[in-house]
A protein has these predicted regions:
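Active-site HxH/HxHxD metal-binding segment of metal-dependent hydrolases
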Residues: 1-33
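Short "lid" loop at the C-terminus of a central beta-strand within the Rossmann-like core
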Residues: 8-9, 55, 148-149
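A short helix-to-beta-strand connector/capping loop
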Residues: 24-29, 44-45, 117-118, 201-204
């Protein structure tokens, strides 16, 4: 199992294991988060995950999830028409031209674009800070904390949290397509006020709730 957390957590895990004489039947790979700069946490054929520093009263990170550019889709009728083999298809889908029976085949002539790569940024807990924008520029969806409404802007600054308006400003500056608000203070009964406030700056805004799910379209 891979664990990503502040470095001091490893001391706690080790102390717990020593006291309890715990022996895992799996490998535990501990990865200390970097609170000073962006860091790649995960990378496979489909997805990349990055952490980036945010501005809070204790060291804290945001996270960026980015799908990699997908393979192109082969036009099925071309397989039989051109006598394409499995190896040829693989090359063409990966944007490589190939030679089939002495004939040059361009990938653009026999494939169509695949699904659009999607992206999602999670920004919490954090004070309003435009320094995060380069890390999340052009992201599809941003989740940004909005602990307070604008009437408590000063309190938000002191406690290093954000208002709904400030979350909207981040989404607008980052050129995001959608903003999800969350981390609301318990003092508020009407969460819709957060959406109303943020929507005056960034129209495509919704509020998260327990069990909230959102499908990012390709």
């Amino acid at each position: 199992i891979n664990v990503y957390a502040p470095k001091d957590l490893l001391n706690l895990i080790n102390a717990h294991n020593e006291i309890s004489e715990k022996i895992y039947n799996f490998d535990l790979n501990f990865n200390a988060l970097n609170f000073q700069k962006s860091n790649k946490l995960y990378d496979d054929n489909i997805l990349e995950i990055f952490s980036f520093p945010v501005n809070h009263s204790v060291p804290c990170c945001g996270f960026l999830f980015k799908e990699k550019k997908s393979q192109r889709n082969i036009i099925k009728t071309k397989i039989k028409d051109l006598g394409l083999g499995i190896g040829d298809i693989k090359k063409l889908k990966n944007r490589e031209n190939c030679l089939v029976n002495g004939k040059a085949i361009k990938y653009k002539d026999v494939t169509v674009p695949g699904n659009k790569a999607r992206s999602y940024a999670y920004c919490a807990d954090t004070k309003y800070d435009k320094k995060i924008i380069p890390f999340i520029k052009d992201v599809d969806v941003i989740y940004h904390e909005s602990t307070f409404l604008e009437e408590l802007k000063n309190k938000a600054s002191k406690t290093k949290h954000s208002t709904a308006n400030q979350a909207a400003e981040i989404a607008l500056s980052a050129n995001s397509k959608m903003l999800i608000l969350g981390h609301f203070s318990a003092r508020y009964d009407n969460i819709e006020k957060f959406v109303q406030e943020a929507s005056s700056i960034f129209k495509n805004t919704v509020a998260a709730y327990d069990g909230f799910k959102y499908q990012i379209k390709n």
